[in-house]
Amino acid sequence: MYYIQYIVARFFIFILLLFPERLRFKFGDFLGTVAYKLIKSRRLTALINLKMAFPEKSEEEIEKIAKKSFKIMIKAFLCSLWFEKYLNKPKNIKIINQENIENAYKKGRGVMAATMHMGNMEASTVSAGEHKIITVAKKQRNPYINDYITKLRGKANYMEVIEKNEKTSRVLISKLKEKKIYALFSDHRDKGAIVNFFGKETKAPSGAISMALKFDMPFLLVYNTFNDDNTITVYVTDEIELKRTDNFKEDVQNNVQYLINIMEDVIRKYPEQWMWFHDRWNNFREYKKNLKNKERRKWKNL
């Protein structure tokens, strides 16, 4: 069954790549609109999250952001299918403050780059230039598709992908001597520190902060925006000075919150670029379980 799924996926990719890039992105816009309308659970998740994050915005504004977010995320996924060619076209990429990556790398201790689920997501890795990258990703259920995606990532980004499991931390630490650039998503819910994010308590991954603190790695935030003309603008922050005391556990907690605050500011600036349909705060789960019927009715037509 997995192999049949893989063959169907490869056939779809083959057909898609026959079309010019401009039409592929138009197809991505179309798929994003369809997904927004048909996948009700994801649509509700995005709308509830946005209503929580931006209570001052009107329903119309919230829906506009949600629809744009769906389109951007679908286009980002499709673009990964021809990432190598896309990233090799200079007109597609603009990098702001790439020298910050270079200056951090020259320190000879590797670099920790926190990344976000926004824009053309993994395209941010182009800011590493010719330096090798290491990252972590969940293994896909379909082993054939998993291998195919891993190969695409490696070809396009000089990227080594570590499977996310109970051994991930040890594997990442064992790679430190290679002085690579670590690119770790740090904005979605995961085991780690309890933080305040858009005014609500939630969990945030602490792996990037923990490693940077423990091994004195230069730390930056790298993210990108997917522009209307289907180019991307990559932003590299100045090196983030992590706060250090004699209490490592508190340092991790405080610095994860500090990073979350920075990311929240970025999301507020570019709200349509972020992945809102992920149940980041368990809002959708709470909606299904706990809201009263009269409150449910308020959302039923969304």
Predicted regions and their residues:
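Catalytic core of membrane glycerolipid acyltransferases/transacylases, capturing the structured
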Residues: 107-166, 190-193
